[in-house]
Amino acid sequence: MSKIIGIDLGTTNSAVAVLEGKDPKIITNPEGNRTTPSVVSFKNGETQVGEVAKRQAITNPNTVSSIKRHMGDANYKVKIEDKEYTPQEISAMILQYIKDYAESYLGEEVSQAVITVPAYFNDSQRQATKDAGKIAGLKVERIVNEPTAAALAYGLDKLDKDERILVFDLGGGTFDVSILELGDGVFEVLSTNGDTHLGGDDFDNKIIDWLVENFKADNGIDLSQDKMAMQRLKDAAEKAKKDLSGTTEAQISLPFIAAGEAGPLHLETSLSRAKFNELTEDLVERTKIPVRNALADAGLTNADIDEVILVGGSTRIPAVKEAVKAETGHTPNESVNPDEAVALGAAIQGGVITGDVKDVVLLDVTPLSLGIETMGGVFTKLIDRNTTIPTSKSQVFSTAADNQPAVDIHVLQGERPMAADNKTLGRFQLTDIPVAPRGVPQIEVKFDIDKNGIVNVSAKDLGTNKEQKITIKSSSGLSDEEIDRMVKEAKENEAADKKRKEEVDLRNEVDQLLFQTDKTLKEVKDKVSADEVKSVEDARDALKKAQEQSDINEMKAKKDELTKLIQDMSVKLYQQAQQAQQASGAQGDTSANNSTNDDNTVDGDFKEVDPDENK
């Protein structure tokens, strides 16, 4: 079975890992970094992902970041020039980039992946993530909750221990708390809670708002109306936030941020850690509630927890660490790299699927309750939140009116008592119910949740055995036909991108060869014949012409011709140098022989010394 890669598809950064032997290993990207910015940019028909895309975010308005915040929103589209992209398509571009460099590292095709999602992602968001994987050419073998994956990374070498751990996962855009029980290789999730719209981006935005407010007060100019200025502020805010994890004050310097009546204006200020804590106090407070809820749902207290694990780059913020310690009564365990733990855990789960990791069982839970709408708009739960998955539950309902020929099944997910306040996952209808008074027909509604947290619902008339089923797919906003079209487009773009990269590489090789040729000709002009020099010059000029005409095939052919001529010339020069060296060596030997007959040569007398003589 081929390798299954583990992908942490993050809001701000993503990472990929693979199991090598018994240990998971992070795969570095082409820039040599262990994480890749979850950023996509479009320019001149070319798509760029990662660090390259992030670097041009200031100057290129067609740059997309933090798309994960919109996963599962069927109405959200990103408009780039004349085309609209869904969150799944943008995410697929990130996944495809990760897939490509994972393949380069492994030296083989990658077609399977375990992808992580926030524990509090609903069905729509999970399905959208799975669709993104499919568009990128990946079969998503398993969707794993991020805190659960981090627990796998933490606990792989502790399979003989019995522990209860609390995973506090604060990433770039989402926040989760999960409580797990580890014992005999079983990783059982007891409860999960969180906020899918809380993360490092929100901390950045607090700094940005503060900078905008102060600059407006000092200069009367609202920087929030200037797109380019806002991007510079975002970069500066992110840097200041990171700096404040290690220092008590961060300097923010943005020259020429705006133009005033008297000329250019500069933003020069400092942000203390105390002020940053004040600005973000409400965000830190928001992290405490899910901790309490997760403990309550698991029926545990702080005293029952053995370890607290921090995951996600935003847990490096000192105020967050202090809040975790104050709320749980435990000093957080920082043995796991917060940026890499999730991807490492996903790779371990990939190893469990392939059979490379044995004696490990992962029991996850559904984060939100599932049910249907019943009479009066009430939400009737069939599966409660924090139920271990996979699971199945059925309940019998009846008709609400006499002679009712059909029932509408409105599938929902959430915790509110009224249907209208919860998330609609899908609707379907069971028809041809025999005529009967209200309350007589027996309609069995059955919910199935698979290991990925994907929901299947069926309704069956127990009197006639007529059944109708629905797999909740449409909630992600994409039909099978749309996904197939996007898969096809992604493959076409992949081929075009590959061709474009090959062209760029070829042009770079040609430039390097032309430079090397001119340099070589200067060095060897007096050492080779005029005919040889001319043949190289002609080949060089032919390559330059092909380069100017952008004729790729001709460039390849002429490059190969010139390369051969340069190599032949280099071999000849090397042989000449070798012959000259040999001749010089022979002359040296002759001189040495002559010197032995010199009348001034003195023969030395040597006396053998007995080692015992001086004892």
From Swiss-Prot:
Superkingdom of origin: Bacteria
Q: Where is this region: Disordered?
A: 575-615
Entry keyword Transport: no
Q: What upregulates this protein?
A: By stress conditions e.g. heat shock.
Basic and acidic residues bias locations: 604-615
Q: Where is the composition biased (Low complexity)?
A: 575-599
InterPro entries noted in UniProt: ATPase_NBD, Chaperone_DnaK, Heat_shock_70_CS, HSP70_C_sf, HSP70_peptide-bd_sf, Hsp_70_fam
Does Phosphoprotein show up as a keyword for this record? Answer: yes
Question: Which terms are listed as keywords in the entry?
Answer: ATP-binding, Chaperone, Nucleotide-binding, Phosphoprotein, Stress response
One GO MF term on file is: ATP-dependent protein folding chaperone
Q: Give residue numbers for the modification (Phosphothreonine).
A: T174
Family membership, please give it.
Belongs to the heat shock protein 70 family.
NCBIfam families linked: PRK00290.1 (NF001413), prok_dnaK (TIGR02350)
Q: What does this protein do?
A: Acts as a chaperone.
In terms of HAMAP family, this protein maps to: DnaK
The entry's protein name is: Chaperone protein DnaK
Report which gene this protein is encoded by: dnaK
